[in-house]
A protein has these predicted regions:
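Glycoside hydrolase catalytic-domain groove-lining segments
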Residues: 1-3, 13-89, 99-100, 106-114, ...
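Short, internal active-site loops enriched in acidic
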Residues: 7-12, 127-131
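Aromatic-rich peripheral "rim/lid" segments of glycoside hydrolase catalytic domains that contact
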Residues: 53-56, 72-87, 95-103, 123-233
Length: 234
């Protein structure tokens, strides 16, 4: 199957406009794919509406080509993460077992399924992009050494969006690769389906659970803090 892949399903008429342009230009393809990150791309309901419109109007299969969610706001390898405490909205729970991650994946699957037979599935991106060396789990006194070790490995082997050899600094082809090394490490390690030591999270079973269902123990995953101001004179 030939697929085209776009982002931003939340933008009004953006993807439907792209689908129309492809149709008008007689572009031959089979699958219209989209990214769907809940912190950027709107609601699952809107996603269903957009994909259903494209599927029914242009008789294409549709899918989610990228979905993910974070299990922590910590930086696993010393390369600043794309999704962090300033990202909004983070509308699922953030927990080390991946409950919020599993819910985000489940909702994306449900959104595609609601399209009907034209909805063919989802891909998770990127489930195995774990740190080279665990920067977050190190003692404060060890972090500088671990980061230096990570940088050496990133530059030699590549780990992030690109290694230095693909950019101007290394005589490569991509001017978008930064010399400050901000593209070299994993900026997605807090959204992997594995912890910072490479151990699979329970949430990796979500692709089985959407068919079988699952029950988990009732437990406290987070506690909201509240602040009150009182005027004792009144």
């Amino acid at each position: 199957l030939i697929a085209v892949h776009y982002a931003d399903p939340h933008r009004e008429n953006f993807q439907t406009g792209r689908a129309k342009a492809l149709h008008d230009a007689n572009i031959d393809y089979d699958v219209f794919a989209t990214s769907f990150y809940s912190f950027w791309h709107g609601s699952p309901e809107n996603l269903t509406n957009v994909l259903k419109t494209i599927a029914e109007t242009y008789h294409k299969k549709v899918m989610v080509a990228e979905v993910s969610y974070c299990t922590t706001l910590e930086d696993g390898d010393g390369a600043a993460n794309v999704v962090n405490a300033s990202t909004s909205p983070l509308n699922y729970s953030i927990d080390p077992l991946g409950e919020g991650l599993a819910a985000a994946v489940r909702d994306s699957i449900a959104a595609v399924s609601a399209v009907g037979e034209a909805g063919i599935g989802t891909f998770y991106w990127e489930p195995a992009w774990v740190p080279v060396g665990n920067y977050a789990g190190a003692e404060e006194s060890q972090k500088a050494a671990i980061l230096a070790s990570n940088i050496d490995k990133w530059e030699k082997y590549g780990s992030g969006w690109a290694s230095m050899w693909s950019g101007p600094e290394g005589g490569g082809y991509d001017p978008g690769v930064s010399e400050d090394r901000s593209t070299h490490g994993s900026q997605w390690d807090n959204q992997a389906m594995f912890d910072f030591n490479g151990k699979a999270l329970p949430a990796i079973n979500v692709y089985k659970w959407v068919y079988t269902g699952a029950e988990g123990p009732v437990q406290v995953s987070s506690v909201d803090t509240a602040a009150y101001t009182m005027n004792y004179k009144d």
